[in-house]
Each structure stands twice: as structure tokens, then as C-alpha cells.
Amino acid sequence: MKIGIYCFLTDYSIDVAKLAVEAEKLGFESLWLPEHPVIPKFRTMQSYLKPGSEGAEELPKQYFDTVDPFVTLGKASCVTTKLKLATGICLVPERNPLLLAKEVATLDLISNGRFIFGIGAGWCKEETEIMGGNFERRW
């Protein structure tokens, strides 16, 4: 069985180098980091949860504070040799496709082929639009 770690890393959470080294030592297969460049204060869709359900009103603080997954996974690649490094997920409609292709190829190169490119389209309309995407046409 392959077991990985998924977490929101922030400036107040564990350092990714320390986490990656320990994860590899303990036999974890992969480290997955999410992407949220910006979470607007006012959102038409507070969450993918049903309105009124627990957690639907406000997102946890780490959603607002999460680090860039590509830079952070690059750091993790420098202190590990076997741990696979993954985006869980990269919000493709919010990115320039040429720059994204370069970032993905670079991370795969510096990690010696250990990068897993997890992709998605996002759930927050305002975030997508702030980042230059079209929410209705994101798929």
C-alpha cells in the first residue's frame, strides 16, 4: 500500500524540509500540497459543503495562509531522494499555461522525476476570477 501525507503548510506550521525528511524516514510514499493563491474574504460559495452544515460558514485559517506548492516542494526535493512530491491540487485555470508548464518541468527535473502533477479546476469563483480565469469555463 502507498500512503502519502497531505497538508496545508503555512508560515506558522512545520518547515517543509523537516516534514519531508521525517516522512521519507518513516516510509511515506508522497507529500501532497494544495494551492490557493488567494481566498477572497467575500465569496458567493463559502464552501463546497451544504449551507448550514458544520464548517460551511468559514474556512480554516490555513486556507488563507497556505504557501506556494511549487516553491515549497522544490525545497522538499533538495532534502529527500525517494519521497514523491505532488500538488494536491494545482488550480490550472488560475495559471498562465506556459509558465505553469515551465514550473512543472523544472520541479520534475530538480526532483529527478519524483513530481506528481495533481490538477483541478477549483471551487471558489471569486478566486478563479481574481487570478484571471473564467469560472464558468474552467473545465
Q: Model-flagged regions — what are they?
A:
Residues M1-V79:
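N-terminal beta1-alpha1-beta2 module of alpha/beta enzyme domains
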